[in-house]
Amino acid sequence: MTVGTLSVVSSTASDTASHVSDTRKRQYQRDEALRKKIISELGKKSGNFESPVRKIRRNGEPGTVDSAALDPALTVHMQSLVTETAQLMAAKRQNCVLVVDDDEQLAGIVTATDIATRCVGAGLNARQTLIADIMSTSPLCITSDTRFDDALLLMIEHKFRHLPVVSDGGPDGSAGDEGDVIGIINMRACLREPLNRIARQQEAAQKLVEALEGAQEEIENKSVSGNTNSSSVSGNHAAEFLEYVESLKKKASGLEIMSLIDSSEEPFLVGTRTTVAEATESMARSGVSAVLVMDNGAVSGVFTAHDVVLRVLAAGLDPYRSSVIRVMTPHPDCALASLRVSTALERMIEGKFSNLPVVDESDAIIGMLSLFHLATAIEQTPEEEEEVFDQAENDAGIEPSNGFEDQQQQLLGNSNEVVENYDVNPPLPLNPLPSNTQQSESTYEYSARQLPKPPVQAWQNENLSSNNKPQEYVGVENDYNFSNNPPTAMSEQSFHPSVSQKPMDTPENGSNSFAASPYLQPYNSASQLAPSYVGSLPQYHGNPSFVEQALQDLVQPTDSASQIFPLNPQSPSQFTIKYRSIAGRVHRLRLDGINSVSDLRTAVEEREKEQLVTLTYIDDEGDVVELVSDSDLREAILLARRRGLPRLEVRGVAAFTNHLESSHPPISTVDSSIGSASVVEKGVANSIVDIHQPTAKADKGNSKKPIYIGIVSSSIVILAVSMWYLRRKR
């Protein structure tokens, strides 16, 4: 999945500026023309319709809701139609209205998401549905003296972005009657205060890091040279000091949005020809307010609930006949995975959008974040971290001209208490590999402590002494999984349990754990060790032939075992199969529930009710490959792993066997390089993809005969009537 013409948001100031393409400018002009038309129509109906109301600004206490610019409290009656409400929201540039009853009392609240999911997504007719049928009753309100943090926590807890604000009366009654609604506050207004606080904290941490860099280098040099004595900082205090500096560096850099991406939740995708009704139905079913629109494998735009209100219902379009490409927002702004959360929030507040697609370095879509994700991230900062930042502001005033010993004592004296708030145990550095390759007691030795060696099981001794593959595999799950990430530096957690964990389980207590470090030597061959080792892992249990065949194709005889095993295998839930149906709908299937092609076909038939479907995928050479046997599926997964893809994309093609047998010869295939998959040649690939074309031609040829017969019959009838008329006239 690649990105089309999108503007990518990075962490630099120049890239943060919004780059609006010509297409989006034209879309903005059309929206403004539509609003003017709606205002004109509403003015003719009501006679005194006003232009969009500006935000309400009040001189309240700083840090409270009363000091923010509130949205106007638009009200509609319970008996109003959804289309009328959508036109009012579009004309007033609002995404939320309050619903009142006959007594002018607050009865509910309706947002753009409610209209999109509860009305259009539920299959209701917006021209006949009352606003009372889709509103949220008994809305939660806050008073004007509520602080921003409390309002934001309330929004995150209940998962909504708008809160009605009522007056607290004030000491002299100047703020209005107590209980009167004075406006509506949205989540963006509540996020400005936390963003300013995070900016101040990161600035203070950065200043302290700059002040401590010199002391850190001198401590590290003394630790390496062994000159640390009792007159200076002790070894334990030096380690705490270095840990404190590293934690400050992380806090100064900020949290990346990649840490918020859940690999099990992917953005919902629709095609350009998907109707608005189908897209909103998918939004309601998945509980999201936006979907990405794909065109030929690239992101063409984003379709949100705001688009449903403004460009569909307010414009008078039919959701069942309008496609999303007509009303979507083209070329949405995207963010790199390395972007800081605070920077992403600032960009969303500046651009006034609530959904942000996330891309990697290769411009591939890896997820989509909403305001809820980012707001939750900044509000989950523990109080301990805030204490660290407060301490950093005080410590940043230390003069660098002090002596090294005095500076260390002063810094450590101020930071020892805050260091206790952290439960961080970084991996200890590794010593270089020993020169003797025959050493078998400890291939990797840690400088701080000697960790216990795991027990050697019987099957491991047998595998190390023989090149024959074992006949029995031990494990608990039935799945194929192997990481294709580049080799990384080995850490303590790669081979041994941490100090806080229990020692390695033994065969007596029923565990089959395996530690690689004492048994993998630089001279070992990965092709000899990999099948037996990986077959013993829990995630490969129950299907030895599947794992063995895949690893024989993946691991070459010249590969080194020390290069293969440091790879961190992904969990079974991280690799998925995405099926795109004939109609363009996308389904996400879990790999641990699919063990063969028949299981995949069964899953497809359950979701799409398509009996005659040919399953295909695109290989690394761009060929259309048909999935016929289990070996084809195994090879497809293996190719996706080699290419570093987290998923396998499978497409369904209609199999019209009657037309194919009568009008086309059998499809010619060539053998694949691995296994026995059938690769459709490019010459006939188009006939499979556009399989409706020969059917249409055949139907068109057959339809010519009835047309010809009808024309001849009509001519004969007209001629007979003319002759009868002429005879009678004579």
From Swiss-Prot:
<feature type="domain" description="CBS 4">
    <location>
        <begin position="328"/>
        <end position="385"/>
    </location>
</feature>
<dbReference type="InterPro" id="IPR053793">
    <property type="entry name" value="PB1-like"/>
</dbReference>
<feature type="domain" description="CBS 3">
    <location>
        <begin position="263"/>
        <end position="319"/>
    </location>
</feature>
<feature type="compositionally biased region" description="Polar residues">
    <location>
        <begin position="480"/>
        <end position="515"/>
    </location>
</feature>
<feature type="domain" description="PB1">
    <location>
        <begin position="572"/>
        <end position="649"/>
    </location>
</feature>
<feature type="transmembrane region" description="Helical">
    <location>
        <begin position="706"/>
        <end position="726"/>
    </location>
</feature>
<keyword id="KW-0469">Meiosis</keyword>
<feature type="transmembrane region" description="Helical">
    <location>
        <begin position="290"/>
        <end position="310"/>
    </location>
</feature>
<keyword id="KW-0677">Repeat</keyword>
<feature type="compositionally biased region" description="Low complexity">
    <location>
        <begin position="7"/>
        <end position="20"/>
    </location>
</feature>
<dbReference type="GO" id="GO:0005829">
    <property type="term" value="C:cytosol"/>
</dbReference>
<dbReference type="GO" id="GO:0005737">
    <property type="term" value="C:cytoplasm"/>
</dbReference>
<feature type="domain" description="CBS 2">
    <location>
        <begin position="135"/>
        <end position="200"/>
    </location>
</feature>
<dbReference type="GO" id="GO:0031965">
    <property type="term" value="C:nuclear membrane"/>
</dbReference>
<dbReference type="InterPro" id="IPR046342">
    <property type="entry name" value="CBS_dom_sf"/>
</dbReference>
<keyword id="KW-0812">Transmembrane</keyword>
<dbReference type="GO" id="GO:0051321">
    <property type="term" value="P:meiotic cell cycle"/>
</dbReference>
<keyword id="KW-0472">Membrane</keyword>
<dbReference type="GO" id="GO:0005634">
    <property type="term" value="C:nucleus"/>
</dbReference>
<feature type="compositionally biased region" description="Polar residues">
    <location>
        <begin position="458"/>
        <end position="470"/>
    </location>
</feature>
<keyword id="KW-1133">Transmembrane helix</keyword>
<dbReference type="InterPro" id="IPR000270">
    <property type="entry name" value="PB1_dom"/>
</dbReference>
<feature type="domain" description="CBS 1">
    <location>
        <begin position="69"/>
        <end position="127"/>
    </location>
</feature>
<feature type="region of interest" description="Disordered">
    <location>
        <begin position="420"/>
        <end position="517"/>
    </location>
</feature>
<dbReference type="Pfam" id="PF00571">
    <property type="entry name" value="CBS"/>
</dbReference>
<keyword id="KW-0539">Nucleus</keyword>
<dbReference type="Pfam" id="PF00564">
    <property type="entry name" value="PB1"/>
</dbReference>
<keyword id="KW-0963">Cytoplasm</keyword>
<protein>
    <recommendedName>
        <fullName>Meiotically up-regulated gene 70 protein</fullName>
    </recommendedName>
</protein>
<dbReference type="InterPro" id="IPR051462">
    <property type="entry name" value="CBS_domain-containing"/>
</dbReference>
<feature type="transmembrane region" description="Helical">
    <location>
        <begin position="358"/>
        <end position="378"/>
    </location>
</feature>
<dbReference type="InterPro" id="IPR000644">
    <property type="entry name" value="CBS_dom"/>
</dbReference>
<feature type="region of interest" description="Disordered">
    <location>
        <begin position="1"/>
        <end position="27"/>
    </location>
</feature>
<comment type="function">
    <text>Has a role in meiosis.</text>
</comment>
